[in-house]
């Protein structure tokens, strides 16, 4: 019984269990540290504005990709490693980006039409396209999760946390609230770029999704 348990633990460790556990702890520490630094850098008024804008963004993100991410997790797991799986991811990436571009215009219009303070209103315009970059990152992560690339999944999550929190702190220090969101874009672009370099070998980013789906049907 004990030997079976040891073997099971070793198998899980080889599949990246310890990487995922370690990355989770590491990311929480980085996020917590970043929040403490952010409170010290920004004034009470600036932090209040940042929290307000961030909360509204989180509300809009309830419509993130219109469920594409959850769908890819489900169908990707069913058709793992098949041409159809790659086609689903390509199709989902396109649809998710289109949905979030529409969402981006909604966020921008909300800021321009319903936020009276002009300095706060412009922040909604600045953050409006963050969901577009966010869903690309999330789909890349789901892809790794489906294929059980647990080690890269963990490293990629940590990379995103470090870049975003680092960008947040640096942006806040030099440019205030606007800098936070501006550097968030830079961090997300860097993370997406790293993901594309790794995922290029899979070929799904470049395949014709409609042709593959039609053939499989």
Model-predicted regions and their roles:
Residues 120-128, 154-202:
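Hydrophobic alpha-helical transmembrane segments
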Residues 59-63, 97, 101, 105, ...:
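Alpha-helical transmembrane segments of multi-pass membrane proteins
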Residues 72, 139-146, 150, 170-173, ...:
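C-terminal transmembrane helix end/exit motif
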Residues 84, 133-156:
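Membrane-interface junctions at transmembrane-helix termini in multi-pass inner-membrane proteins
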Residues 1-30, 84, 213-217:
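N-terminal membrane topogenesis motif
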Residues 24, 30-35, 51-77, 131-136:
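Small-residue-rich midsections of specific transmembrane alpha-helices
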Residues 35-59, 182, 215-217:
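Interfacial/gating helices of multi-pass transporter permease domains
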Residues 6-11, 42-46, 60-94, 145-151:
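Transmembrane-helix boundary and interhelical linker motifs in polytopic inner-membrane proteins
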